[in-house]
Amino acid sequence: MKREEAFIINQNRHYWDTYADLWFGATALPKYGVCFATENELHLFGDVSGKKLLEICCGSGHSLKYHAERNAGELWGVDFSQKQLENAKQYLRENGYSAKLICSPMEADMDIPNDYFDFVYSIYGIGWTTDLDGTLKKIASYLKKDGVFIFSWHHTLNYCVAWSC
């Protein structure tokens, strides 16, 4: 990892470790973002019963819980903020669920199996990457042959739409 990328990741990690509680539960499934269509409208995931799912930038675990409630078979989450993962672990435990949680930047090599997941997804997280090409290649390697990557991120026009909602 380049020095500049490491600096950016550390700055972002510091922010999320400091302010994780302020963002608890924000921008999580079924919502894809502010004034976006929801999973209940789009049905991008369909039936996740028994499926293996990996969330990139899992934050406080609310989207993981969303899938647990829909009988996902196996849940994994990655986040570079230890505080976010502590919140996720506690939130999932309080609701009777669990997930394999990994504290790491999404750009890093991790102990995540290749050709394993039915879905990899990121709700408002992928835009934090310092290496989009490398991150997308990693995500592709985690997916089964017919696996699906779903993500949401904002566009500058969203600010105009959000103010009119």
Where are these regions (language model features)?
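N-terminal, positively charged/glycine-rich alpha-helical extensions of SAM-dependent methyltransferases
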Residues: 1-26
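Conserved alpha-helix/loop element of class I SAM-dependent methyltransferases that forms part
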Residues: 28-51
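A short, aliphatic-rich alpha-helical micro-motif
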Residues: 47-48, 114, 136
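Class I SAM-dependent methyltransferase SAM/SAH-binding core
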Residues: 54-56, 60-108
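A short acidic, Gly/Pro-enriched loop at the edge of an enzyme's catalytic core
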Residues: 110-119
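A short SAM/SAH-binding and catalytic strip from SAM-dependent methyltransferases
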Residues: 118-132
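A short glycine-rich, Lys/Arg-flanked "PGG" loop and its adjoining helix->strand segment in the class I
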Residues: 133-148
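Conserved class I S-adenosyl-L-methionine
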Residues: 148-165
